[in-house]
């Protein structure tokens, strides 16, 4: 993998990652394991570039917020992320001019709370937190206070290997430390990580309303990103919440294996700043062990 130097606006610096292998099956015989080819893909991390990254970041934000993406001014939010071009990374293949396959950033909610996209996010996250017992007791009050909370936004294409994640998070921690040394507003009390999860639910075509409700209550959370399952162990509060714009019929259109549907949910993890680096180290170890 290419390297990205902390706070170097041209990208490509100090964090190494072994090239993940991407497996491609021969189209002529998809059932024959002997036709499996191993393709080494070289991923590189870059700082944000306003001339290149707007559409890629906006597309990934739309994926992150799923059906609730329509509630936000994603264009303004993308611009704000890109303006912070020394904090966070995009992950690309081959060339800086390509669209991002993944992105990671942190926004100071207190510093930017008067800006429309951040005000929308604060209102939305406060409302959604109230629907989850773990989050309701701490997050609404914290977001209404004058404490500096770092909102972590991260997303990647679903077929991206998990190995790209630890270098991105490690880079960002280094960049935050450098920014704090430069007296920039990145000294946080907490980090609020927004992600997605899902439940497998029986098709609404096959269930009465009572059975649907019971199935939703019993369905176990599954994670699109395996690192989230590890990171939540370090959170003072975490939990899933329903998207406000998604009805049960949507899950029916995404029928998965064994006649089950996929019901995406939002997911938040609130981590104390003093425990954040440990959480990042834990997901690096977890991904290294799991692969």
Curated annotation (Swiss-Prot):
Any single GO CC term annotated in Swiss-Prot or TrEMBL for this entry: nucleus
Lineage top rank: taxon: Eukaryota
Gene: BCP1
Pfam families (alphabetical): BCCIP
Family stated for the protein in its record: Belongs to the BCP1 family.
Function: Involved in nuclear export, actin cytoskeleton organization and vesicular transport.
Protein name, per record: Protein BCP1
Region annotated Disordered, chain positions: 1-34
GO biological process terms held by the UniProt record: protein transport
Protein transport among keywords: yes
UniProt subcellular location: Cytoplasm; Nucleus
Record flagged with keyword Nucleus: yes
Record keywords, A-Z: Cytoplasm, Nucleus, Protein transport, Transport
């Amino acid at each position: 993998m290419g390297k990205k130097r902390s706070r170097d606006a041209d990208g490509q610096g100090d964090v190494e990652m072994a090239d993940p292998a991407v497996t491609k099956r021969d189209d002529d015989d998809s059932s024959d394991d002997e036709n499996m080819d191993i393709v080494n893909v070289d991923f590189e991390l870059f700082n944000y570039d306003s001339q290149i990254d707007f559409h890629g970041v906006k597309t990934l934000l739309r994926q992150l917020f799923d059906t609730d993406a329509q509630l936000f001014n994603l264009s303004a939010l993308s611009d704000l992320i890109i303006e912070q071009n020394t904090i966070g990374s995009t992950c690309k293949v081959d060339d800086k001019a390509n669209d991002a396959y993944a992105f990671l950033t942190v926004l100071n909610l207190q510093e930017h709370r008067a800006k429309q996209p951040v005000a929308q996010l604060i209102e939305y996250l406060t409302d959604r937190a109230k629907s989850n017992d773990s989050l309701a007791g701490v997050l609404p009050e914290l977001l209404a206070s004058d404490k500096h909370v770092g909102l972590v936004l991260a997303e990647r294409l679903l077929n991206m290997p998990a190995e790209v994640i630890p270098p991105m998070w490690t880079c960002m921690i280094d960049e935050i430390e450098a920014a704090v040394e430069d007296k920039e507003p990145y000294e946080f009390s907490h980090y609020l990580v927004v992600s997605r999860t899902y439940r497998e639910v029986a098709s609404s075509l096959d269930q009465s309303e009572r059975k649907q409700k019971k199935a939703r209550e019993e369905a176990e959370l599954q994670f699109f990103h395996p690192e989230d399952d590890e990171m939540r162990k370090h959170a003072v509060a975490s939990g899933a919440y329903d998207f406000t714009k998604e009805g049960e019929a949507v899950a029916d259109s995404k029928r998965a294996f064994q006649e089950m549907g996929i019901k995406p949910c939002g997911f938040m993890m609130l981590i104390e700043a003093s425990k954040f680096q440990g959480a990042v180290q834990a997901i690096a170890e977890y991904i290294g062990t799991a692969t």
